[in-house]
Amino acid sequence: LILIPSRLSASRLPNKPLLKINGKSIISLVVDRAKRSKLGEVIVATEDNKILNEVKKNGGNAIITSNKHKTGTDRIYECLSKLKKRNIDYIINLQGDEPNIDINDLKRLYILTKKNNSDMSTLASEIHNKKIYKDKNIVKVITNLKLNKNNFPYAKDFRRLITSGKNIYHHLGVYIYKVKILKKFINLRQSENELSNK
């Protein structure tokens, strides 16, 4: 199951999900990519009727959620709780503003997470442009090991601004959780680091 949290009231770029790229809304492009991954049903979780209508108009599925959520994770959990009982092991949380997400990366994330029986995983990529380190609009992840296809490091920290260090990567905003872990995760108190890096 791929759940896509999406809302119009983003602080950095309001109405972003409905902006068009080559005549198609960003949210519709994200839904199309998610469907092409063939990793399961794709549902957009949104508080906005405009997004709901846009998704449905383009053949997608969406569910209205509360407008009180502090995070996309809270939003997808509400969406999950509204779905009828299903046999789901993992939930992929794909951000609604990632129209260029690589389908193969989504597949690798699922395969590696399942193979390693991990409770939760996320995607990151190498940083090739040094300006990204100082760009507060791009979240960076610091890992315990150098990232490569042969290891599965864990995230030590997530930061918006960072000037130096090693094992720093561009966080791609895609998560996968075991359903039981998602249920535990949303009940945790937000850390100071999470609140300061929003």
What kind of region is each of these model predictions?
Residues 43, 49-111:
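Short phosphate-binding loop-to-helix
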Residues 189-198:
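Donor nucleotide-sugar recognition loop
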Residues 1-46:
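N-terminal glycine-rich phosphate-binding loop and ensuing alpha1 helix
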Residues 46-47, 101, 177, 196:
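A conserved hydrophobic position in a structured secondary element of the catalytic/binding core
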Residues 101-190:
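Conserved core of the sugar-phosphate nucleotidyltransferase
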Residues 39, 85-88, 115-119:
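Short, high-confidence coil segments that cap the C-terminus of an alpha-helix
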Residues 5, 93-95, 123-124:
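Short beta-strand segments
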